[in-house]
Amino acid sequence: MLAALWVIGIQLPASANAAPITTSEPPQLVPLADGVMIEPVLTAGDVVGGYQMSGVPDGLGAFRSSATTIELYMNHELAFADDDPSNARISHLTLDNSGAVVSGEYAVTGSEGFEEFCSATLATVGGTPWFFTGEEAPRSSREGSSIALNSATGRYVETPWFGHMYHENVVPVEGLDRSLVVVAEDGQAGRSQLYVYTSSTLRRSIHGEGTLRAWVPTGHTDANPSPYDIAGGQTLSGRFVRIPQRMNTSPKELEAASQAIGAFDFVRIEDAVADPADPGVVYFADTGAARKETFRGRIYKLSIDPSRPTRADLEVLLDGDASDDMFNPDNLAVSAKALVIQEDRNYARSGYNRLLVYRFADESLEAVARTDPRPIAIKRAGGPGAWESSGVIDASELFGEGWWLLDVQAGDVRVSVPGPSLVPDSAEGEGGQLLRVFIPNT
């Protein structure tokens, strides 16, 4: 997500080049539709001053800090437990108006012990942009925790009260009578719930002065609320039911508490995004899994009642198992005109991971780009779905209408990256790339 406001007193990256740079590497994404422009910004292994980009980039957040500069935060979904060169990191880059990188540093270095920061959301608290994200790793030492990073101070607040789980994203929703933060759980297939954290203000939510809740259907379902209970064209009413923090001491206890209150079991929730043009509307992806209620995945539309935010209705917007050309949706971003969807196929042999656009005006779904993995990556992964794009955000307020920022996770290739010391070229890890993408009519 992004914020268009200019922020005074922002903590800027310390490591700068004499002149802004863009990567010399080719784009890891290629267009599939007319008019699409793809501009690689930075590639894993690139050096900007004393900063070197790590691999496996994921969630992004960006805002304008002056008439000529843009601040970008970028997750790196890393963990020593996965044989990565460090634990989770967050890069802080300053870009110019062309998208070139002016400077870079690590806001979170990996020494903090978090694992696998996934998608992310940027929201403003009292005029200051905060970067919200969480661990997609419940077996970490923090058992699947989350953080909110203050861009003005460079310090973060750990937010375990948002739930111990496989976090896909942490999404503050604006325009409601109370603060509500959607917490998307990328959990065990068939046991994935949609959570929220409610409070009087977002600042109080950050500091744990609120209530954790899970979505429970109140409409007609069977004894096990699941995607079998809703199809395209139907609406399922529900409410967010309180879960005491004493039941949030571990992912296992939180799961048990969710089952006890009858929470809806999605197959495997991935990203979520709040629609800034429609207060209370949240789109989220259920990526699907083999031998589950949805195989190719769905996109859901959640309509939260702005005046009574604990009430929300669920609809199926897109269904890959029905007539929609979509395979395992993962990350999402939204503008006034379109919803952008990034695939992450469960089986590499099933095809390239694509960038899809759903246009609200005519309800059309179009593939506009795909990843471009190297032949060696395709061979090692067993198919063209070796690489995935991720982290997409609407960048229209930064670069103009139709512009998006996203990244590619280039698995099955190794590049030189900074190790625990942050010294450039001191380790090897998986690749990746940050890109600007222009998509017409979005």
Describe the residue ranges of each PLM region.
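Sequence/structural signature of beta-propeller domains
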Residues: 16-442
